Swiss-Prot record:
Residues 41-322 are extracellular. The keyword Transmembrane applies. The keyword Phosphoprotein does not apply. The chain crosses the membrane at residues 20-40. May catalyze the final step in cell wall teichoic acid biosynthesis, the transfer of the anionic cell wall polymers (APs) from their lipid-linked precursor to the cell wall peptidoglycan (PG). One of its GO terms (cellular component) is plasma membrane. This is Polyisoprenyl-teichoic acid--peptidoglycan teichoic acid transferase TagT. It holds the Pfam family LytR_cpsA_psr. Residues 1-19 are cytoplasmic. The gene is tagT. Its EC number is 2.7.8.-.
Amino acid sequence: MEERSQRRKKKRKLKKWVKVVAGLMAFLVIAAGSVGAYAFVKLNNASKEAHVSLARGEQSVKRIKEFDPGKDSFSVLLLGIDAREKNGETVDQARSDANVLVTFNRKEKTAKMLSIPRDAYVNIPGHGYDKFTHAHAYGGVDLTVKTVEEMLDIPVDYVVESNFTAFEDVVNELNGVKVTVKSDKVIQQIKKDTKGKVVLQKGTHTLDGEEALAYVRTRKADSDLLRGQRQMEVLSAIIDKSKSLSSIPAYDDIVDTMGQNLKMNLSLKDAIGLFPFITSLKSVESIQLTGYDYEPAGVYYFKLNQQKLQEVKKELQNDLGV
């Protein structure tokens, strides 16, 4: 049915894009706030370890004019990778389980976040129509970027890839994040999910990493829409907390974690340059694609509503000024 939510029989994992954004925000905060030779050297080493170059070069082919990262609106593709060593997969062979494109409008000081369903039925250049998640398995980050650019007809300026081990650490390094818990059903479901390890109370509280993780991952208490709102609440809390450099008491462990678990074409210079703008954002809006379940020959896909896709394309193009 049109507009029906994408459903799977297997247990869904945590919305991993929250972790990716958390890691990126922490990187930007620490990059901008580092002082002293030791701090700079440590962060610079982590940045070099995390840095990857795209085969296309620094600028997207979708950019007609030369891209000025200090002045132009820009986009960041956030990828959450499920690389399982037990299957002998390398990171490039793994599928992308979380796929979020974020556009940043310089003039308006706003951001828009678009989650791309992993099972979306899209054209993967050189491979034909398949699940979006397979683009990464076929050609790593380069092919994933090409697929997004063709699908949305916009430039992907930066890409950040994570294997999701740092969420709890990031929240804990921020000394927790403030969240308002409203639902008794959510409280009871979290208690059940964690077998009593996490017990929340109604009201506004500062959640540690384990509590925040439980809050964003529980899925049986309410709808997908309300779960998405909880995830956006935590993400917004992370961004707000990250604006205060004093909220990070020690960065050694988190910098090490980022170096090992993030891959990006952002340099340390890029990160420091972007920090003031990102932390001055007036709003972060979440936009959504729609579609329906599609199962030719018994294989599940999520077929996108083409009218909605065209609307999203235009919205993102306007946001980037392309």
